[in-house]
Amino acid sequence: ASTAGFAQKMKVQVDKESGTITVNEVPQAILIKENAPGQLGINKNFTITNLDGKELLYFVFTQEPETNSRGYKTGKTLTYYTLNFIESRGQGRRPGTMTALGAAKIAMKNGLIVDGEIDPDAQKKFLLKY
């Protein structure tokens, strides 16, 4: 049995002009970024489409006041991304902020897009993790 496929490194890149996501220099998907509301361009929302432009994933920057177990606000702000699967309406959550490359890597390294569509098995695993 060959283990060549397992040893291969996955190099994910995003072209700044076109938004094309490549894995080992092979185009896989397109990343569209837009400013998250109220963030003055600092944080972004990300849509990932297949190469034909069909929307597959939407990562939304979210902030909300943190509350304690009694429901009182602690004065801190929770910052996270809501990770939405458009077709299935599946939803995950990742704490913190994310760059365009980070959004591309989370989709590609989890094998979410296969032949231009969301892979259902990869989606199930992903939603267990996030």
Describe the residue ranges of each PLM region.
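Cysteine-centric segments in proteins
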Residues: 8-130
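C-terminal segment of classical bacterial N-terminal signal peptides
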Residues: 1-6
